[in-house]
Amino acid sequence: IMNNWVKKQADFCIVGKKGVRDNLQIAVALLGYRQEKAGEEIIECLKHQFADGHAVLTWYPYDDTRYSDQPFWIVWAVCELIKETGDFSILEQKVSWQDGGEATVLEHVKAAVRRLIEDKGENGLVKIRFADWNDALNVTDDPEAETVMLSHQFCLALRELRRLMERIGEEDYAEFLGQEYETLKAAINEKAWDGEWYARALSRKGNIGAKDSPGSKIYLNAQTWAVLADVAEGTRLSAVLAAVDSMEQDFGFPLNMPPYPAYDPHVGRMSGMLPGLFENGGVYCHATGFKILMDCKCGRGTKALETLKKIMPDSGKNPSSRSGAEPYVFTNCYSTNSGYYGKSYQSWPTGTSAWSMMGLYEG
């Protein structure tokens, strides 16, 4: 599966998806074996970024809803492209903006950084706007709400871009990025730490993913990206790893626990889903892929491999005869709801293929 079918699945995603966030993740996975195609896809995604730094969710069909995370994926993907190819000249390539004109790849990256800095809220974290990576977490009753997951991701982007800028001699900008990293990291640890794990979002109307939050108490992505970005250190790192381990299920790790029992307008669409399905407490295999990289970073190779096996097609504890998915294709989600336990939802077009590859080949 990992030497053949997962690559076919990634190729399918590149053809079938036309979204900045989605295609950049697939493109980075392609860097391991189709560098030219990966580079072309990353440049194509940059063409759908606006000069103010934000980017469309999808260009076909066209959707410019303000998902706050698009700029992060741009910075991350360009850094990964150059790390894999060693071709620094990419930074000088001219690429058009979605709203007209053109600029170098480096200017596109800097615009993405500016967008995320300008989008910071009162706690110093990045505002969630309509949603972040989790399309269904819509804190629409508080336009000032801040996303902890994306703030972790922005820390990672600042760290990686600083290293790149040092390599090309942009020392002043590298120093600026380093200062931004430390400032954001400190804000996250001051405002989002909840004693045993990180909250998922901060809001004047009540934090989401905290121990005193109604409905659901802990979110996976707010922990995994804290580790990947080096935000969680020392005793907090140990606590985060323990919190993640406590979420383990037979066939992966749920996006949040426990599921929301009823619709909560403060949380948005995910809380209206049947408990245990999709984003509402389902095992979101794409996000479990983030967890695999977290394990690898921490030297937890055995746990990384065990986790990968849990979400593999036709896995031992959730065979295709129960999940309903093809025995050779990764799926996006498995249900933890007792009435649909282990059932698969949406195989083929999912970032699970990309993150599973990255976990196995790069972790």
Task: Describe each PLM feature range.
Residues 11-12, 47, 51, 80, ...:
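Conserved helix-loop functional segments at active or binding sites
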Residues 5-9, 26, 45, 181, ...:
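Conserved hydrophobic/aromatic pocket- or pore-lining residues that grip, position, or stack substrates
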Residues 56, 153-268, 309, 313-344:
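Catalytic cores of carbohydrate-active enzymes
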Residues 52-65, 129-146, 203-212, 267-277, ...:
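Acidic/His metal-coordination segments adjacent to aromatic residues that form catalytic metal sites
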Residues 16-18, 215-218, 281-283:
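Short helix-capping and inter-helix turn/linker motifs at the boundaries of alpha-helical repeat units
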Residues 121-130, 191-193:
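C-terminal ends of transmembrane alpha-helices
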Residues 1-18, 40, 44, 115, ...:
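Low-complexity, Ser/Thr/Pro/Gly-enriched N-terminal "stalk/linker" regions
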Residues 20-23, 29-126, 147-151, 155, ...:
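Aromatic-rich carbohydrate-recognition surfaces in CAZymes
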